[in-house]
Amino acid sequence: MAAEFDGKIESKGLNPGLIVLLVIGGLLLTFLVGNFILYTYAQKNLPPRKKKPVSKKKMKKEKMKQGVQVPGE
């Protein structure tokens, strides 16, 4: 019985679905590692972001809420 199957077993190589999964997984892993490296580099070397300047109108409103007299009024 074992002699019947000797010639019929062939090596087909890797499954095409497995190859696609490995390629997509590799690309995703490369993307995530690259993002992490860029993020750590930016945290060390880039200056902190500047805050937006507060408008004079908003400053007056805040001071009015606190009850402080606004100069010039």
UniProtKB/Swiss-Prot annotation:
Indicate yes or no for the key word Secreted: no
Q: Which domain of life is it from?
A: Eukaryota
**Could you tell me which residues belong to the region Disordered?**
47-73
Q: Which organism is it from?
A: Arabidopsis thaliana (Mouse-ear cress)
- The name this protein carries in UniProt is DNA-binding protein S1FA3
GO biological process annotation, one example: regulation of DNA-templated transcription
One GO CC term on file = nucleus
Show the InterPro entries listed in the entry.
S1FA_DNA-bd
Keywords annotated in UniProt: DNA-binding, Nucleus, Repressor, Transcription, Transcription regulation
Q: Which residues cross the membrane?
A: none
* Compositional bias (Basic residues): 47-63
Q: Which GO terms describe its molecular function?
A: DNA binding
Function field:
DNA-binding protein that specifically recognizes a negative element (S1F) within the RPS1 promoter.
What's the family? Answer: Belongs to the S1FA transcription factor family.
